[in-house]
Amino acid sequence: MTTESTPAITVVAAIIRGEDGRICLSKRPDNKHQGGRWEFPGGKVEQGEALSAALARELEEELGMAGAESAPFMTIAHQYDDLHVTLHFRDVRVWQGDPEGREGQRVQWFFPDELAGLCFPAANQPVVNAIQLPEQLVVAPEDITLHELLAGIDRLNGEQQGLYLRQWSDHAEVAAVVAQCQQRGVKVWLRAVGTQSVATAKALGVFAVHFSGRTLAQLDERPAFDGIISAAVHDQAARDKAGNLGLDMALVSPVLPTPTHPGKPALGWPQAELLMKGAPLACYALGGVAPGDLVNARDHGAVGVAGIRAFWP
């Protein structure tokens, strides 16, 4: 929350993606706010200026990148002790010229998995986590055999799709699924119902664990897990709790009506946006959405989309 004594600014920043998958970062000068830390290039948005225009201007001024085209990725609201910042992160994949520090700042390219070892301003941490995430989270159908599941994994695109296992009990079968996913470069989410399942997830080396809304309500602290921790979010109270616990990701649902839950009220895009945009963690839109809804979902604050029927290959 801002106060009259706390300055507030709006910033737009670029996730500049090279053809090899690396991300271009710059290092803040020591004499600036949050100096000496790595950041996603960008700057302040002038009053009345469109986000895309502001980012194109900043990238040309700072890095000599001409004609940068961008699309929404994630919006974060963050309160520092001395400043309230709203950051609009945008994907940049098209530009002209080689990025270079025109203001004396250091510029360097990093692979996404290298970002976790760098020092960023605190407000950037949710987007650092979000960059590790696939655009789509494919929820495995509950009534599927192991053979069908393994065959489906072979059809997934590991660069764009992750796999969420909601139902599992046989440790050997889950180990086989995780091993095949790792061979295919597919990140795995495993449903966690308690400390034992988190320990199992650790032992299996899965990328993420996911908690239901009911389990989230019972948590008092962030579980001890080195990977991504996700939770189901259906309302503001759950989103706030997930953020306060320092979780990394939320599945916000149901965004739209679904055949699996007939008659259950859906959030709708406007209400879903209130939960997703500005959230302190990465949000996926779940429920009634399809892979083709990604651009619309990002316009409403999500970093990705998730589902069963429209996603399972």
Describe each PLM feature range:
Residues 76-99:
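Active-site-adjacent beta-strand/loop module that shapes the phosphate/pyrophosphate-binding cleft
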Residues 66-75, 90:
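A short coil-to-beta-strand element that immediately follows conserved catalytic motifs
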Residues 209-219, 249-263, 289-313:
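Glycine-rich phosphate-binding active-site loops on the catalytic face of alpha/beta enzymes
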Residues 138, 233, 266-276, 280-293, ...:
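Glycine-rich adenosine-cofactor-binding loop
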Residues 100-153, 158-159:
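Nudix hydrolase/Nudix homology domain
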Residues 22-62, 73, 187-191:
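Conserved Nudix-box catalytic region and its N-terminal flanking loop in Nudix hydrolases
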Residues 137-143, 160-222, 226-242, 251-253:
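Catalytic beta/alpha-barrel core
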Residues 2-24, 75:
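Conserved N-terminal beta-strand and adjoining loop/helix that marks the start
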